[in-house]
Amino acid sequence: MEDDVAALVVDNGSGMCKAGFAGDDAPRAVFPSIVGRPRHQGVMVGMGQKDSYVGDEAQSKRGILTLKYPIEHGIVTNWDDMEKIWHHTFYNELRVAPEEHPVLLTEAPLNPKANREKMTQIMFETFNSPAMYVAIQAVLSLYASGRTTGIVLDSGDGVSHTVPIYEGYALPHAILRLDLAGRDLTDYLMKILTERGYSFTTTAEREIVRDIKEKLCYVALDFEQEMSTAASSSSLEKSYELPDGQVITIGNERFRCPESLFQPSFLGMESTGVHETTYNSIMKCDIDIRKDLYANTVLSGGTTMFPGIADRMQKEITALAPSTMKIKIIAPPERKYSVWIGGSILASLSTFQQMWISKQEYDESGPSIVHRKCF
């Protein structure tokens, strides 16, 4: 597909927005889903100060801004800010005219229907898209891994979910959603670093902690054993330089933080961990297809990027499953972007072209068309 008529693929995550052209093998633009507004009164005339900043620009000016994420737990909570992010995506990042390209958007499974209708409405009415489609994130990740059957554990910044898929069909009764993801881990790391005497409180400082999490955290294979190693030696300690040059040291926080994926009680949450959620999801499926799901457990999303997570999942699910069951955890190296890559594959398939919702269909039926055409 040429860029001039190529479909746009926009994966709006709670934390990062990934955007690009169908047929490409990686997104052209990846930027934080943030809208920042100045905390202070502008005093310099002619500075060209704006009343809001989006993405990387908001990130770089974060010291003077209040940062807000318009998507929480995978659901858009602030549509005005969301529109700003889409505007920024089309005009500044991809530099395209949205009225000239079909656009494929993604959403979390089990999202409110109204969320999906509003997305459709904004695409057609604000951006005049010629055609659009909304796809479920986890299904796209499975496409990207080259499978049509498997269970996807998709964990991003705002929401995690397990989606069993058989021969290309998601099994909605067995989809489980867990509102525990990267942002909760960042918040938890902020909290346990405070116990060490480092205080991080503002929205800008949260971004520093997110960076510490991404660079230094890992999942322990055996949590108790790792805790005793950390207590008896300093071999697990790492240092991190803050933007002002101050150096902080972190030890057992490195694996205590992502451990909450497996033990949500650390965060004061009652839910089951990601391993048990995956198992429960498989158990909700027909007995005949479970074997295929165990053997094709695919990890996707940024929160599955912690070193050690695949081995730990293998260990935990093996402990839950029948003893003879073959269990395979697939952790593709590009899993941070596998939702986007799957979208790029889907939107460039010739068989997909009749699936688009056209502007004409929208004008005839209104926003509810999205439930009939996208599933």
UniProtKB/Swiss-Prot annotation:
InterPro entries referenced in this protein's UniProt entry, alphabetically: Actin (IPR004000), Actin/actin-like_CS (IPR020902), Actin_CS (IPR004001), ATPase_NBD (IPR043129)
Sorted UniProt keywords: Acetylation, ATP-binding, Cytoplasm, Cytoskeleton, Hydrolase, Nucleotide-binding
Pfam family for this entry, one: Actin
Residues recorded as bearing N-acetylglutamate in the entry: E2
EC number: 3.6.4.-
UniProt main location, coarse: cytoplasm
Swiss-Prot/TrEMBL catalytic activity: ATP + H2O = ADP + phosphate + H(+)
Residue(s) carrying N-acetylmethionine: M1
Molecular function as annotated in GO: ATP binding; hydrolase activity
GO CC terms of this entry: cytoplasm; cytoskeleton
PROSITE patterns per UniProt: ACTINS_1 (PS00406), ACTINS_2 (PS00432), ACTINS_ACT_LIKE (PS01132)
Compartments where located: Cytoplasm, Cytoskeleton
CDD domains: ASKHA_NBD_actin
Annotated function: Actins are highly conserved proteins that are involved in various types of cell motility and are ubiquitously expressed in all eukaryotic cells.
Assigned protein family: Belongs to the actin family.
Name used for this protein in its record: Actin, cytoplasmic
